[in-house]
């Protein structure tokens, strides 16, 4: 757990799910119809899937596709804007883009404006919300916050140094925002924010759930906090009798293919749950 084997990573491009994803790459270097359309077969979500597969970060076809996005879809506010340069960029989308663009080794200069855009959209309560620059949201979203946190983590893990102190502060405050909600509860009522976020889904896409949050926290090296415990207990209760975890739900949309079926035991969720419990379970 937690150890990448470069020789296996190289094989992902020619075998199994990784080879399947790459086979859908169009001749001009993209997937689907456009960068963000349709969900979930667009370039954006396919690149995110490939990153999560831990395919070699040196894959040149993937790097070329990301460079095309950087060269053609930068918005006037510095982020990636699939809907036109003058349209306001989406925080959640740019958090995810930063995640895989960092993993696949884009030049730091190409990512600086995305960092600037994201940091400009920090909310007063510590997190992020994709509606902060459109309809004037005043409370952070767990969905946007986890996407940006994952992007910041991959950016720093990949050795980039641009605005590191600002990113560390944003990371700290965003983690605190999630912990204030015990990872899934309203900070006002203590009730579950939304029943969907306690379901184990994969792929997560842009959507938050407790396993995605816990896996981020273990990956970021965050120390155990008692406010994680309710989510950890929920995760352990979802374990099947054979020791694995299921896919409890799928996010509707077009897919290139189904890696796993809802209701079945899941290799993805089992791997992620084991990583979480290895770090946080006594």
Model-inferred region functions:
Residues 1-282:
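Preference for long, amphipathic alpha-helical scaffolds in soluble/luminal domains
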């Amino acid at each position: 757990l937690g150890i990448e084997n470069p020789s296996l990573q190289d094989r992902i491009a020619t075998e199994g799910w990784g080879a399947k994803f790459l086979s859908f790459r169009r001749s001009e270097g993209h997937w689907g119809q456009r960068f963000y359309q349709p969900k979930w077969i667009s370039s954006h979500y396919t690149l995110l899937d490939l990153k999560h597969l831990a395919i070699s970060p040196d894959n040149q076809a993937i790097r070329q596709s990301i460079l095309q996005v950087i060269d053609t879809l930068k918005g006037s506010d510095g982020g990636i804007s699939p809907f036109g340069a003058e349209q306001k960029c989406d925080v959640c989308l740019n958090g995810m883009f930063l995640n895989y663009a960092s993993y696949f080794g884009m030049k730091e200069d190409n990512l600086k404006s995305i960092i600037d855009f994201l940091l400009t959209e920090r909310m007063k309560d510590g997190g992020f919300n994709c509606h902060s620059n459109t309809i004037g949201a005043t409370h952070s979203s767990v969905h946007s916050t986890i996407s940006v946190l994952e992007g910041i983590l991959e950016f720093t893990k990949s050795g980039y140094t641009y605005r590191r102190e600002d990113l560390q502060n944003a990371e700290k405050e965003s983690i605190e925002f999630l912990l204030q909600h015990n990872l899934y509860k309203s900070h006002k009522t203590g009730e579950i924010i939304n029943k969907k976020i306690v379901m184990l889904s994969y792929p997560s896409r842009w959507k938050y759930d407790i396993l995605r949050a816990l896996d981020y926290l273990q990956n970021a090296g965050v120390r155990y906090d008692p406010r994680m415990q309710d989510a950890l207990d929920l995760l352990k209760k979802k374990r099947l009798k054979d020791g694995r975890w299921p896919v409890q739900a799928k996010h509707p949309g077009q897919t290139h293919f189904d890696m796993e079926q809802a209701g079945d035991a899941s290799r993805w969720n089992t791997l992620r749950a084991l990583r979480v419990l290895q770090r946080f379970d006594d």
